[in-house]
């Protein structure tokens, strides 16, 4: 029974490492459970506030916890297999059977390929098993460590996307005001291709490395989740403008599709519905003051039609420690 338990634990851990590090379908069961648990502990300790600096350490701790869980699970699986047969490990000096602590020690240095040599496997079968375990340990631990590199690369792209959106504007109104040249929104559409490219890549990264959701920036003006909500609200305002306002509708539609796919994917991390505050109506006065021909009677029905979408956006904000006041800051003065 102990032998079978060890084999099953090894297979489960091996599948989890393989799925997490070598596929684009996200993390395994163990990885996702550890990531959610550690992230939830940090979120609770931070008081569910996105501004808390404590959350900036959650991503690193999640990665370390996942790596530690893989190593401990592999170690435990080999220990259970060896412990299932007393005498499977013996002292190289006295030839006496190893006790449980010594067997645990042997399992650890076998997986890590340290090869200390003070304890050895007894019998050809256990020697072959120890060699196979050493090869597996070397392979899986190397894969686990190298997994960190693409994850950090994906986090850098996430930060780049958040900074780019916020450089265009710190609120939906400010983004449009900064892009308006008195005749069209060429300032926005000149950056639309770059935004869409980064957003698509960020979505793919989220599918491949869901742990990047745990990496947090405590500055709302640099955090990617508020930035994406700002962009989504700004695109909705552009969609409600009169037809006579010149726009690149193809670029806008492609950006909207990219936003739709990303937000659908993020909704797999739901927030507590009771914690989601009602989304406020957008203040269109700054846009009118800047000379942007937006018609409130045309925009409000669009806003109401998107109520479910805005509720989902509010849930995403709450799940990351933000709310709508971080989206509708004071818009930039026209000029």
What name fits each language-model region?
Residues 3, 9-17, 67-70, 78, ...:
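Pore domain of cation channels
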Residues 15, 31-42, 101, 105, ...:
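Membrane-interacting alpha-helical segments
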Residues 24-49, 93-94, 157-173:
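Membrane-interface amphipathic/juxtamembrane segments adjacent to transmembrane helices
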Residues 45-62, 118:
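Cytosolic juxtamembrane amphipathic/interface segments immediately preceding
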Residues 57-75, 224-228:
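Transmembrane alpha-helical segments and their cytosolic interface motifs
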Residues 76-92:
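Transmembrane alpha-helix boundary signature
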Residues 158-228:
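Non-transmembrane accessory domains of multi-pass membrane transporters/channels
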Residues 178, 191-194, 213-216, 220-335:
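Soluble C-terminal extramembrane regulatory/interaction domains of multi-pass membrane proteins
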């Amino acid at each position: 029974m102990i032998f079978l338990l060890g084999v099953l634990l090894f297979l489960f851990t091996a599948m989890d490492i393989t799925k997490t590090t070598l596929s684009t379908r996200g993390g395994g069961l163990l990885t996702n459970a550890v990531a959610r648990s550690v992230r939830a502990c940090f979120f609770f300790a931070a008081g569910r506030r996105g501004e808390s600096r404590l959350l900036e350490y959650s991503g690193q701790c999640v990665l370390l916890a996942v790596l530690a869980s893989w190593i401990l699970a592999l170690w435990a699986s080999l220990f259970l297999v060896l412990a299932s047969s007393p005498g499977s490990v013996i002292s190289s000096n006295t030839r006496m059977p190893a006790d449980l602590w010594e067997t645990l020690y042997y399992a650890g240095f076998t997986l890590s390929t340290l090869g200390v040599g003070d304890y050895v496997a007894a019998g050809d079968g256990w020697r072959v098993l120890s060699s196979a375990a050493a090869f597996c340990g070397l392979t899986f631990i190397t894969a686990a460590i190298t997994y960190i590199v693409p994850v950090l690369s994906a986090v850098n792209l996430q930060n780049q996307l958040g900074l780019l959106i916020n450089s265009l504007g710190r609120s939906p109104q400010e983004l449009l005001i900064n892009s308006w040249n008195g005749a069209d929104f060429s300032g926005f559409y000149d950056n639309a291709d770059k935004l869409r490219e980064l957003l698509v890549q960020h979505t793919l990264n989220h599918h491949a490395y869901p742990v990047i959701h745990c990496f947090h920036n405590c500055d709302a003006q640099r955090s990617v989740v508020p930035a994406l909500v700002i962009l989504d609200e700004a695109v909705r305002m552009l969609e409600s403008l009169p037809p006579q306002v010149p726009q690149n509708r193809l670029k806008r539609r492609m950006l909207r599709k990219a936003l739709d796919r990303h937000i659908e994917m993020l909704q797999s991390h739901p927030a507590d519905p009771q914690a989601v505050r009602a989304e406020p109506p957008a203040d269109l006065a700054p846009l009118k003051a800047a000379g942007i021909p937006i018609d409130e009677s045309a925009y409000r029905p669009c806003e109401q039609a998107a109520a479910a979408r805005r509720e989902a956006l509010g849930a995403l904000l709450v799940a990351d420690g933000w709310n709508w006041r971080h989206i509708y800051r004071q818009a930039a003065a026209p000029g």
